[in-house]
Amino acid sequence: MRITLALVTGTMLLAGPVAAADWKLLTFPDQGFGIESPVPLVKGAGTYQAAVAGRIPTVTYSGELDNIRYKVTIIDISKRPAEALNLFEEMEALTELQGKVIGNDSMGIEPGKLRQYGRELVLQAKDGSFRRIGLMYSKGKIFQAEGTVLPGGDRESIYPERFADSIIFDLDPKRREERCADPNNFKTPEGK
C-alpha cells in the first residue's frame, strides 16, 4: 500500500503542472516603455480612429501564447498636447463600448515621485474574449497594454493582468531598483 501511494505521489509530482511561462522585461527605448511578457512581441502598425482624435497612426507590439494575446498599442499625440486629457478620456470611453465592462479602476505604476496613474479596464468582449487593458499617458503618447484571453482560453489566468500592469516608462534598471528598495517610495502622503 505504501509503495503504491509513493509511486502515485511521485508520478503526480513528476507530471506536475505545466511549466509557468518564462516572463522577461522587454524594453522598447524608441517608444519609451518596457513591459513584462512571456512571449516576444512583434512590431506592427495600425490606425486609431475616433471622433475627437480623428485618424492617428499607431505602433503596435504583439504576441500570443496559450490562447492569450499580449499587445501594446502606442498612439503618439505629442503634437496635440492641449488635447491630451480629452483624447485619453475618449479612448477610455470608446474602449468601454467594446463589450460588457466588468471593471474600471485607476492603476498606478512606478514607485515614488515618478509614479504615474492611468486606467485599467476589464471587459467581456462581444466576441467572447476576456480583455484586461491598462491605459497610460506618458511623454506625449497614450499606451494601451492589453492581455486578452481568447475564446476558449483560461479566463482565470492571471497572465493578462500581469501583462497589462507591468508597463514601465523608466528604462534605467539601476534607478528603478534604487526606487523600489526605498520604503519611503511606498508611503501615502500621510506617511503610512
Language-model-derived ranges and their functions:
Residues 1-4:
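Positively charged n-region of N-terminal signal peptides that target proteins for export
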Residues 6-15:
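Bacterial N-terminal signal peptides
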Residues 21-40, 186:
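Short N-terminal segments immediately surrounding and downstream of signal-peptide cleavage
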Residues 58-88, 144-146:
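A short acidic-to-branched-hydrophobic micro-motif
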